[in-house]
Amino acid sequence: MDFTRRRFLLLTAAASAGTPPAQAGIDHLPIDTTFKNVERYHRIMTKAQAAGWGQIPIGPRMALLGRECLGIAYVGYTLEIDDRVECPSANFDGLDCWTFFEIALGMARLLERPKAVYTPGDLLKEIQWTRYRAGLCTGNYLERIHYLNEWFIDNEARGNVKDITRALGGAVRLKGRESREMTMLWKGYRYLRNNPSLRPQMARIEAKVNELPVWYIPKA
C-alpha cells in the first residue's frame, strides 16, 4: 500500500467517533506479545492530554499524534504476532503505512473520553473495534479485515468513519482490480503459512472483496 500525505489527510478527515463497547477487549495473548513499547505510548498520550488535544477536531488531532510517531522505524508484517491465535496488537517500535494510521486513529478516539491514565488495553480495544469485522475478535485470523475497501465499508456501516471519496468530485469506480495478495503471497503471512486450512477460506473472502465497489480520484 502506497501511503502518501494526501491519503493520510483523507483518512483523518473521514474519521469519526463511534465508541467500542466496553466488552470489546479480549485477552488472547500476553501483553508483551500484543503491545510493544508501552513507554512510548504513555509519553505520547501524556503529552496529548497535557496539551488538550482531545478538544480539537479529530483530523488535526490525528495529524498531531501521527507526528509524535515520526522516527519510528517502518516495519512490515507487525500484525503477524502468533502462529495460530489472532489478537488485537499495537507496535510502537515498528509501523507500516496502515498501522501508522490505525494507531493514530485509536489514540485520537481515546482522547475523546478523558481519563487519568490511558492503558495499553484501552488502545487495544480501540484497535479491535476498527480492525475486525463488526469490531469482534475471538482469536480467528479470518476475523481481521485485510483489505482497505472492506475496512471502509465495515467501519462506515458502524459509524466509525465516513468515506468522502465520491463527495470530493471527480471520483470514478475502479474496474478490473483483483485482490489476491493474501492467497498468492501466503508465505509472507505467518498465520497462513502455519495454517494451510485458512488459505481456501481467505480465497473466498478475497472473492467477496473483489465484488465490493472501489472509488478513487485519478491524478490530473
Each language-model region and where it sits:
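Sequence/structural signature of beta-propeller domains
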Residues: 33, 49, 53, 57-80, ...
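Charge-rich, solvent-exposed alpha-helical interaction surfaces
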Residues: 44-47, 201
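Acidic/His-rich structured neighborhood in mature extracellular/periplasmic domains
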Residues: 74-212
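C-terminal segment of N-terminal export signals and the immediately downstream linker at the start
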Residues: 20-44
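Active-site-adjacent substructure of cysteine-protease-like catalytic cores
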Residues: 213-220
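N-terminal export signals
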Residues: 2, 7-24
